[in-house]
């Protein structure tokens, strides 16, 4: 099956290229850029030499439709909202890595993203692509909104607790840390080497745009869920996310019960690895892979659960999950082309 990538020169775009070029079923028909049309992708990224021969093309929906069946949008917020109607109109299926179609309520998007929302009809039709929890919907979708990186790690961590109803609905606290690639390719003062090396930054306190998509899914799982407390930090690694999540249980429990809950929940999810009791993951242990590793602890004294989850923000947090969703969309085994062992050390 032929695919196209729009926004091919960003970090999400080049990770899609890496995965799709090695995929046994998908093949890249075309790569598209806004600012570097006519350039060979190998001139922009020399590490693709002797692997790719593509020239970056302008964006023409009708031309893309003649070459591809699925389009990946690795574009900034606001851009996908403009492009997607044109792509859908010519019969293409769209997997969008931006936040433009993640929220059903347009006012929620406008509040958190500070820009106009996409067409309301498309917001209602878009499927939120949290692969492990939306498989049937993804398989029948025309438009998939790939989840945010923080949202993916947080939702996989908290899903068993919320869906089982064992935690107090207003008790969820999420402490999130991300590698610098999560901030995108464009450099800023905060991502500048002298500012970040041997340092860390907290940013967007109580204002991160992934909050509403997390809360939207929590409410779908449990209507009684209340707003969460969510903080994000930038740490001096290139890839990786670590979520530390805290919640208070309604009734006294044992760690063995929680361990069993997580193991049973993700028993048939190939990319979610629940650590043995007392073990906790680190971001390096999933680097370059589509895995989400989870560890659980329980404090009987405070009756609080602590859940630690880690992902590679460029893989399970972006391109990897997008390809996982494309596999589901194409009727393939969802692990196809994604069975990479983590890069370690």
Swiss-Prot record:
Its EC number is 1.2.1.38. InterPro entries: AGPR_AS, AGPR_type-1, NAD(P)-bd_dom_sf, NAGSA_dehydrogenase, Semialdehyde_DH_NAD-bd. Catalyzes the NADPH-dependent reduction of N-acetyl-5-glutamyl phosphate to yield N-acetyl-L-glutamate 5-semialdehyde. Its main location: cytoplasm. PANTHER family: N-ACETYL-GAMMA-GLUTAMYL-PHOSPHATE REDUCTASE, CHLOROPLASTIC-RELATED, N-ACETYL-GAMMA-GLUTAMYL-PHOSPHATE REDUCTASE, CHLOROPLASTIC-RELATED-RELATED. It is an enzyme of class 1 (oxidoreductase). One of its GO terms (molecular function) is NAD binding. It comes from Bacillus mycoides (strain KBAB4) (Bacillus weihenstephanensis). GO terms for biological process: L-arginine biosynthetic process. It is found in: Cytoplasm. The active site is at residue 149. The keyword NADP applies. It catalyses: N-acetyl-L-glutamate 5-semialdehyde + phosphate + NADP(+) = N-acetyl-L-glutamyl 5-phosphate + NADPH + H(+). SUPFAM superfamilies: Glyceraldehyde-3-phosphate dehydrogenase-like, C-terminal domain, NAD(P)-binding Rossmann-fold domains. Keywords: Amino-acid biosynthesis, Arginine biosynthesis, Cytoplasm, NADP, Oxidoreductase. One of its GO terms (cellular component) is cytoplasm. The keyword NAD does not apply. This is N-acetyl-gamma-glutamyl-phosphate reductase. Pfam families: Semialdhyde_dh, Semialdhyde_dhC_1. Belongs to the NAGSA dehydrogenase family. Type 1 subfamily. Pathway: Amino-acid biosynthesis; L-arginine biosynthesis; N(2)-acetyl-L-ornithine from L-glutamate: step 3/4.
């Amino acid at each position: 099956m032929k695919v196209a990538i729009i926004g091919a020169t960003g970090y999400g775009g080049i990770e899609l290229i890496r995965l799709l070029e090695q995929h046994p079923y998908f093949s890249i028909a075309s790569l598209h850029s806004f600012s570097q049309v006519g350039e060979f992708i190998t001139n922009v990224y020399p590490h693709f030499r002797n692997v790719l021969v593509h020239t970056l093309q302008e964006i023409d929906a009708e031309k893309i439709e003649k070459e591809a069946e699925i389009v990946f949008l690795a574009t900034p917020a606001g851009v996908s909202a403009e492009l997607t109607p044109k792509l859908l109109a010519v019969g293409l299926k769209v997997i969008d890595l931006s936040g433009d179609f993640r929220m059903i309520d347009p006012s929620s998007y406008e509040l958190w993203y500070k820009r106009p929302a996409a067409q309301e009809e498309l917001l209602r039709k878009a499927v939120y692509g949290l692969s492990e929890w939306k498989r049937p919907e993804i398989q029948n979708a025309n438009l998939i909104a790939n989840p945010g990186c923080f949202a993916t790690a947080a939702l996989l961590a908290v899903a068993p607790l919320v869906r089982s109803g064992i935690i107090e609905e207003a008790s969820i606290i999420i402490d999130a840390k991300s590698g610098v690639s999560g901030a995108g390719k464009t450099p800023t003062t905060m991502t500048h080497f002298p500012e970040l090396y041997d340092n860390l930054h907290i940013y967007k306190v109580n204002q991160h745009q992934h909050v509403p998509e997390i809360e939207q899914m929590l409410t779908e799982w449990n209507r009684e869920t209340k707003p969460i407390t969510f903080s994000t930090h930038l740490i001096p690694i290139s890839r990786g996310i670590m979520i530390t999540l805290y919640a208070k249980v309604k009734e006294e429990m044992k760690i063995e019960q929680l361990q069993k809950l997580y193991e049973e929940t993700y028993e048939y999810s190939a990319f979610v690895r629940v650590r043995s009791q007392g073990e906790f993951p680190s971001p390096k242990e999933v680097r370059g892979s589509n895995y989400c590793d989870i560890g659980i602890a329980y404090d009987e004294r405070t009756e609080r659960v602590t859940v630690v989850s880690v992902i590679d923000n460029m893989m399970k947090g972006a391109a990897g999950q997008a390809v996982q969703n494309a596999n589901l969309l194409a009727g393939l085994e969802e692990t196809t082309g994604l069975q990479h062992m983590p890069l370690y050390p």
